[in-house]
Amino acid sequence: MKKIAFIILAVIALTASHPWQNKRVAYLGDSITDAKVLPNDTHYWGYLQEMLNTESYVYGISGRQWKHLLDQANKLKTEHGDEVDAIMIFMGTNDYNSGTPIGEWYTEATEVVNANGKMVERKRRDHVFDNTTFRGRINTVLDSLKKMYPTKQIVMLTPIHRGFAQFSEKNVQPSEEYCNSCGEYIDAYVNSIKEASAIWSVPVIDLYSLSGLMPSLPEQSMYVPRGNDFLHPNAEGHRRMALCIYYQLQALPCTF
């Protein structure tokens, strides 16, 4: 009897539809999302498209930071209007590399407010919308997207671990073992994205922790291109990311 029950559960699991099956998904991001970077390799969104039969609207552009995300979102809005089911944001590694200050989420001031019929002094906080800081940029983007797409699912992906990369004599990017020009390590940016998830009620998939990718390790060379690029995953690295995203998305509705 137990064996029969197990078989039934297995069949149900295999035939149950993934909540993101056949959906229209927009991807905003940087070079790891950009179809023009490593064009001969399948990207994570391409694997998700194969696994879920999704329609992909890809707007990622190499080198972009959080301050550029609204340009991509506005282009999505112009080209597709509201005809999109979900938006995925994969951004942050270039903010770290460029030395963007982390900044603050809020400003705080004391105001007089009516509480239970009495005018009392209370502290009040307001979001910082400052495009010169990382948290200010995230606040600006998520505030705008929540207003632009109030009924749509929005999901953030954290940056993955970074290895050394050299693309030219003047474009040399140290590995994540080094802090950036403002003294921050990459995990400060990863943690800020995770904090933003709670602040803005936007789900986050922590690829930094869950993907298993450590491009600085020689033993994981199968996940990165040959040469001096230990920053961008190759097709196998993207496949691993896609599998992680696929299973995390099982717990999230794509539409409401």
Give the label of every model feature segment:
Residues M1-I4, K152:
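Positively charged n-region of N-terminal signal peptides that target proteins for export
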Residues M51, A73-F256:
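Alpha-helical cap/lid subdomain in secreted, periplasmic
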Residues A16-P19, V25, Y59, L142, ...:
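Residue-level detection of beta-strand scaffold positions
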Residues H18-S62, K67, Q72-E83, I87, ...:
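Serine-esterase "nucleophile elbow" of acetyl-processing enzymes
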Residues K3-K23:
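Bacterial Sec-dependent signal peptides at the C-terminal "C-region" and cleavage site
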Residues I12-A13, N40, G163, C244:
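Alpha-helical transmembrane segments and their juxtamembrane interfaces
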Residues I8, G29, M91:
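Residues that line or immediately flank small-molecule/substrate-binding pockets and catalytic motifs
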